[in-house]
Amino acid sequence: MDWSHRAFPYSISGTQHAAYQDCIVKFGHESMWQAAIDIDEYPFSPTDQQPKFAQRKVASFSKAMPIASELSMQNFLFLGKPLDSNEHPLLIDRLWRRTHGPANALVKPIYKPSHVARAAVHHNALSKGNSVNFPVTELRMNHYWGARLQNWGDDTPEILGKTQPDTSMETIVKNLKDCITHCLPSVDLVYRKEWS
């Protein structure tokens, strides 16, 4: 959902909290679970890359943890020197190095909208239930954060030391490219250099 009209001036409460709260208010009644993720964040399962993997992981984990109202995806940063954007227009096809483990505590939630008292970026204020971390072996967040805060650039010794090669998104990238080429009337619907 586009929230760019609230992006300038940017503030956590005026932009992100407000966007997530608005999503709960407008669409929270449409599903049992909802996710609050940004355009550079991708849920990823090391064990399941088939369509609807996130739904299956949420159903399975929430059944095992019935007290959970919020399931947190831990944050794995993808960093380093990106491949050329003209040859690799999809962001997830430009970076193939990630942090060894969760990079920080900046998780992103999948939550029951009916159990959220107030939306927040990393952990909602819950009216009932608990927040539980997904095991990273089941579901994590691949975060292509570098352009914003890490200044993507050359693979320096520092970047190489805190990252490892990760090609686990190859199947997803291939499927997306195939679909973009064969499922859409024009690749321009996906590959845009700037927002209008």
Residue locations for each model-derived region?
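Active-site-proximal specificity loops/subdomain of glycosyltransferases
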Residues: M1-A36, F44-S45, Q49-Q50
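Intrinsically disordered, low-complexity acidic segments that are enriched in bulky aromatics
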Residues: M1-W3, I67-F78, P82-D84, L90, ...
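Hydrophobic/aromatic beta-strand patches that form the interior of the parallel beta-sheet core
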Residues: A35, S69-L71, L139-N142
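Conserved donor-nucleotide/metal-binding helix-loop-beta segment in metal-dependent transferases, i.e.
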Residues: S45-K81
